[in-house]
Amino acid sequence: ALWKTMLKKLGTVALHAGKAALGAAADTISQGA
């Protein structure tokens, strides 16, 4: 189904965005900001 494909794409995008956000947060914390 088309909605399943869209959902999978959204999930992938959300996952990458989450990883990027976590990475940025970790960098900020490690710098003591």
From Swiss-Prot:
UniProt entry tagged with the keyword Secreted: yes
GO biological process, one term: defense response to bacterium
Alanine amide: modified positions: 33
Record has Secreted as a keyword: yes
Domain of life: Eukaryota
Compartments in which it is found: Secreted
Pfam families noted in UniProt: DD_K (PF12121)
Entry comment describing in which tissues the protein is expressed: Expressed by the parotoid glands.
Chief place where the protein resides: secreted
Stretches that traverse the bilayer: none
Entry's Gene Ontology cellular component terms: extracellular region
Annotated keywords: Amidation, Amphibian defense peptide, Antibiotic, Antimicrobial, Secreted
Matches recorded under InterPro entries: Dermaseptin_dom (IPR022731)
Stated family: Belongs to the frog skin active peptide (FSAP) family. Dermaseptin subfamily.
Function as written in the Swiss-Prot or TrEMBL entry: Possesses a potent antimicrobial activity against bacteria, fungi and protozoa. Probably acts by disturbing membrane functions with its amphipathic structure.
Name of the protein in question: Dermaseptin DS VIII-like peptide
